[in-house]
Amino acid sequence: MPQLIPFYFLNQLTYGFLLMTILLVLFSQFFLPMILRLYLTRLFISKL
């Protein structure tokens, strides 16, 4: 069972943490402001 090898566990933990950090940065920098701008645009258009 490779899951019981500590190096395998640390490798999986490191890459999982790295992937979550990269996804968090991408979402906070690019995707969420784009969704917010789209929502605000729809809100302003509907109030006209």
From Swiss-Prot:
Pfam families per UniProt: Fun_ATP-synt_8
Membrane-spanning parts: 16-36
Keyword Isomerase in annotation: no
Cellular compartments per GO CC: mitochondrial membrane; proton-transporting ATP synthase complex
InterPro entries, A to Z: ATP_synth_su8_fun (IPR009230)
Subcellular location: Mitochondrion membrane
Entry keyword set: ATP synthesis, CF(0), Hydrogen ion transport, Ion transport, Membrane, Mitochondrion, Transmembrane, Transmembrane helix, Transport
Topology relative to the membrane: Single-pass membrane protein
GO molecular function, one term: proton-transporting ATP synthase activity, rotational mechanism
Family that this chain belongs to: Belongs to the ATPase protein 8 family.
Record note on quaternary structure: F-type ATPases have 2 components, CF(1) - the catalytic core - and CF(0) - the membrane proton channel.
Function: Mitochondrial membrane ATP synthase (F(1)F(0) ATP synthase or Complex V) produces ATP from ADP in the presence of a proton gradient across the membrane which is generated by electron transport complexes of the respiratory chain. F-type ATPases consist of two structural domains, F(1) - containing the extramembraneous catalytic core and F(0) - containing the membrane proton channel, linked together by a central stalk and a peripheral stalk. During catalysis, ATP synthesis in the catalytic domain of F(1) is coupled via a rotary mechanism of the central stalk subunits to proton translocation.
Designated name of the protein: ATP synthase protein 8
Species: Vanderwaltozyma polyspora (strain ATCC 22028 / DSM 70294 / BCRC 21397 / CBS 2163 / NBRC 10782 / NRRL Y-8283 / UCD 57-17)
